[in-house]
Amino acid sequence: MEKDLVSVYRPPISSAYIPTHSITLEEVWERITSKDLQEKTQRLRTLRSEGKEEEYKSLKKESLPSVTFGGTFDYRRIDPQEYREYLLRELEREKDPIKVSKMKGTIGLLEGKVGLLESSGFVIIDIDHISETGLSLQELKDRISEDKEIGVRLVFTSPSGDGLKVVCRVSSQITDTDSYKTAYNSLRHF
Protein backbone atom coordinates (compact mmCIF):
# COMPACT_ATOMS: atom_id res chain seq x y z
CA MET A 1 0.00 0.00 0.00
CA GLU A 2 1.08 3.58 -0.62
CA LYS A 3 2.38 5.84 2.12
CA ASP A 4 -0.11 8.57 1.25
CA LEU A 5 -1.77 9.89 4.37
CA VAL A 6 -5.43 10.39 5.24
CA SER A 7 -6.91 12.32 8.18
CA VAL A 8 -8.64 10.58 11.09
CA TYR A 9 -11.38 12.17 13.21
CA ARG A 10 -12.55 11.04 16.61
CA PRO A 11 -16.23 10.43 17.18
CA PRO A 12 -18.84 11.80 17.21
CA ILE A 13 -19.15 12.22 13.46
CA SER A 14 -19.87 15.87 12.73
CA SER A 15 -19.96 18.13 9.73
CA ALA A 16 -17.24 20.26 11.28
CA TYR A 17 -14.23 19.11 13.18
CA ILE A 18 -10.47 18.97 13.46
CA PRO A 19 -8.62 15.73 12.65
CA THR A 20 -6.75 14.07 15.50
CA HIS A 21 -3.95 12.68 13.32
CA SER A 22 -3.04 11.24 9.92
CA ILE A 23 -2.40 7.61 8.99
CA THR A 24 -1.65 5.44 5.94
CA LEU A 25 -4.16 3.13 4.22
CA GLU A 26 -2.36 0.20 5.80
CA GLU A 27 -2.97 1.72 9.22
CA VAL A 28 -6.62 2.35 8.29
CA TRP A 29 -6.94 -1.37 7.55
CA GLU A 30 -5.24 -2.27 10.85
CA ARG A 31 -7.73 -0.09 12.73
CA ILE A 32 -10.75 -1.45 10.87
CA THR A 33 -9.69 -4.99 11.72
CA SER A 34 -8.72 -4.16 15.33
CA LYS A 35 -10.57 -5.91 18.14
CA ASP A 36 -12.02 -2.62 19.42
CA LEU A 37 -13.57 -1.57 16.11
CA GLN A 38 -14.69 -5.11 15.31
CA GLU A 39 -16.61 -5.20 18.61
CA LYS A 40 -18.20 -1.79 17.97
CA THR A 41 -19.13 -2.82 14.44
CA GLN A 42 -20.68 -6.07 15.64
CA ARG A 43 -22.76 -4.14 18.18
CA LEU A 44 -23.99 -1.86 15.36
CA ARG A 45 -24.87 -4.80 13.12
CA THR A 46 -26.78 -6.45 15.95
CA LEU A 47 -28.87 -3.31 16.43
CA ARG A 48 -29.62 -3.25 12.71
CA SER A 49 -30.58 -6.91 12.60
CA GLU A 50 -32.97 -6.27 15.52
CA GLY A 51 -34.63 -3.48 13.53
CA LYS A 52 -33.34 -0.72 15.82
CA GLU A 53 -32.41 1.64 12.99
CA GLU A 54 -32.45 4.89 15.01
CA GLU A 55 -30.27 3.37 17.74
CA TYR A 56 -27.94 2.05 15.03
CA LYS A 57 -27.58 5.48 13.40
CA SER A 58 -27.02 7.24 16.70
CA LEU A 59 -24.45 4.74 17.99
CA LYS A 60 -22.62 4.71 14.66
CA LYS A 61 -22.31 8.49 14.73
CA GLU A 62 -21.25 8.54 18.38
CA SER A 63 -18.84 5.59 18.48
CA LEU A 64 -16.93 5.23 15.22
CA PRO A 65 -14.01 7.36 14.10
CA SER A 66 -14.09 8.67 10.54
CA VAL A 67 -11.51 9.19 7.81
CA THR A 68 -11.15 11.64 4.93
CA PHE A 69 -9.63 9.46 2.23
CA GLY A 70 -9.06 12.45 -0.08
CA GLY A 71 -5.98 13.48 1.89
CA THR A 72 -4.90 15.27 5.03
CA PHE A 73 -6.83 18.23 6.37
CA ASP A 74 -6.25 20.82 9.07
CA TYR A 75 -9.99 20.99 9.52
CA ARG A 76 -13.11 19.80 7.78
CA ARG A 77 -16.35 21.63 7.65
CA ILE A 78 -19.59 21.87 5.75
CA ASP A 79 -21.28 24.75 7.55
CA PRO A 80 -18.91 27.60 8.58
CA GLN A 81 -21.16 28.72 11.44
CA GLU A 82 -21.45 25.20 12.83
CA TYR A 83 -17.67 24.78 12.61
CA ARG A 84 -17.07 28.12 14.35
CA GLU A 85 -19.42 27.05 17.17
CA TYR A 86 -17.61 23.72 17.42
CA LEU A 87 -14.25 25.48 17.74
CA LEU A 88 -15.57 27.83 20.40
CA ARG A 89 -16.82 24.82 22.42
CA GLU A 90 -13.46 23.08 21.99
CA LEU A 91 -11.63 26.24 23.07
CA GLU A 92 -13.45 26.14 26.40
CA ARG A 93 -12.15 22.60 27.07
CA GLU A 94 -8.66 22.84 25.57
CA LYS A 95 -5.75 23.36 27.98
CA ASP A 96 -2.81 23.17 25.53
CA PRO A 97 -1.86 26.80 24.66
CA ILE A 98 -0.53 25.81 21.23
CA LYS A 99 -3.81 24.14 20.27
CA VAL A 100 -5.75 27.11 21.66
CA SER A 101 -3.70 29.49 19.52
CA LYS A 102 -4.21 27.35 16.41
CA MET A 103 -7.97 27.16 17.01
CA LYS A 104 -8.24 30.93 17.50
CA GLY A 105 -6.35 31.46 14.25
CA THR A 106 -8.55 28.97 12.43
CA ILE A 107 -11.73 30.74 13.56
CA GLY A 108 -10.54 33.84 11.73
CA LEU A 109 -9.60 31.99 8.54
CA LEU A 110 -12.65 29.83 7.89
CA GLU A 111 -14.61 31.43 5.09
CA GLY A 112 -14.26 29.68 1.73
CA LYS A 113 -11.60 27.20 2.77
CA VAL A 114 -11.80 23.44 2.61
CA GLY A 115 -8.78 22.77 4.82
CA LEU A 116 -7.00 20.35 2.46
CA LEU A 117 -3.30 20.23 3.33
CA GLU A 118 -2.23 17.48 0.94
CA SER A 119 -4.16 15.32 -1.50
CA SER A 120 -3.80 11.56 -1.29
CA GLY A 121 -5.20 11.03 -4.78
CA PHE A 122 -7.79 8.64 -3.31
CA VAL A 123 -11.53 8.66 -3.89
CA ILE A 124 -13.93 6.53 -1.85
CA ILE A 125 -16.98 4.88 -3.33
CA ASP A 126 -19.84 3.76 -1.08
CA ILE A 127 -21.87 0.82 -2.33
CA ASP A 128 -24.97 0.41 -0.19
CA HIS A 129 -27.76 -2.18 0.06
CA ILE A 130 -25.81 -5.01 -1.58
CA SER A 131 -28.32 -7.58 -0.33
CA GLU A 132 -30.85 -6.05 -2.74
CA THR A 133 -28.61 -6.81 -5.75
CA GLY A 134 -28.66 -10.58 -5.39
CA LEU A 135 -24.85 -10.67 -5.08
CA SER A 136 -23.09 -11.85 -1.97
CA LEU A 137 -20.92 -9.32 -0.17
CA GLN A 138 -17.84 -11.50 -0.60
CA GLU A 139 -18.51 -12.09 -4.31
CA LEU A 140 -18.76 -8.37 -4.96
CA LYS A 141 -15.71 -7.64 -2.80
CA ASP A 142 -13.68 -10.20 -4.77
CA ARG A 143 -14.82 -8.82 -8.14
CA ILE A 144 -13.97 -5.26 -7.13
CA SER A 145 -10.58 -6.23 -5.70
CA GLU A 146 -9.65 -7.89 -8.99
CA ASP A 147 -10.64 -4.88 -11.14
CA LYS A 148 -7.36 -3.30 -12.28
CA GLU A 149 -9.06 -0.50 -14.23
CA ILE A 150 -10.37 1.44 -11.25
CA GLY A 151 -7.20 1.51 -9.13
CA VAL A 152 -8.62 -0.22 -6.05
CA ARG A 153 -6.38 0.20 -3.00
CA LEU A 154 -8.68 -0.89 -0.17
CA VAL A 155 -12.09 -2.58 0.10
CA PHE A 156 -13.94 -3.14 3.34
CA THR A 157 -17.43 -3.92 4.56
CA SER A 158 -19.40 -0.92 5.82
CA PRO A 159 -20.57 -0.79 9.44
CA SER A 160 -24.08 -1.82 8.35
CA GLY A 161 -22.77 -5.13 7.04
CA ASP A 162 -24.73 -4.56 3.80
CA GLY A 163 -22.35 -2.31 1.91
CA LEU A 164 -18.79 -1.83 0.78
CA LYS A 165 -16.37 1.05 1.00
CA VAL A 166 -13.98 1.06 -1.95
CA VAL A 167 -10.91 3.30 -1.88
CA CYS A 168 -9.52 3.95 -5.38
CA ARG A 169 -6.43 5.76 -6.60
CA VAL A 170 -7.23 8.28 -9.31
CA SER A 171 -4.68 9.36 -11.88
CA SER A 172 -4.78 13.06 -11.10
CA GLN A 173 -4.07 14.78 -7.82
CA ILE A 174 -7.12 16.27 -6.20
CA THR A 175 -6.61 19.88 -5.17
CA ASP A 176 -10.13 21.22 -4.68
CA THR A 177 -13.80 20.28 -4.63
CA ASP A 178 -14.13 20.43 -8.43
CA SER A 179 -11.18 18.10 -9.09
CA TYR A 180 -12.55 15.69 -6.46
CA LYS A 181 -15.94 15.65 -8.20
CA THR A 182 -14.25 15.05 -11.57
CA ALA A 183 -12.25 12.14 -10.14
CA TYR A 184 -15.31 10.70 -8.40
CA ASN A 185 -17.43 10.98 -11.54
CA SER A 186 -14.75 9.15 -13.53
CA LEU A 187 -15.59 6.11 -11.38
CA ARG A 188 -19.39 6.39 -11.69
CA HIS A 189 -19.58 3.54 -14.23
CA PHE A 190 -18.34 1.37 -11.43
Summary of predicted features, one role per range:
Residues 53, 61, 146-154, 189-190:
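Structural alpha-beta junctions
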Residues 134, 139-143, 170-190:
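Helical (often loop-to-helix) elements that flank the catalytic cores of nucleotide-handling enzymes
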Residues 109-114, 141-159:
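Catalytic micro-motifs at enzyme active sites that drive phosphoryl/nucleotidyl and oxygen chemistry
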Residues 13-15, 74, 132, 162, ...:
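Generic "edge-of-domain/loop-turn" microfeature
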Residues 122-150:
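A short, contiguous, amphipathic alpha-helix enriched in charged residues
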Residues 1-121:
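DNA replication initiation on ssDNA origins
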Residues 125, 153-175:
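Histidine-centered divalent-metal-coordination microenvironment in nucleic-acid enzymes
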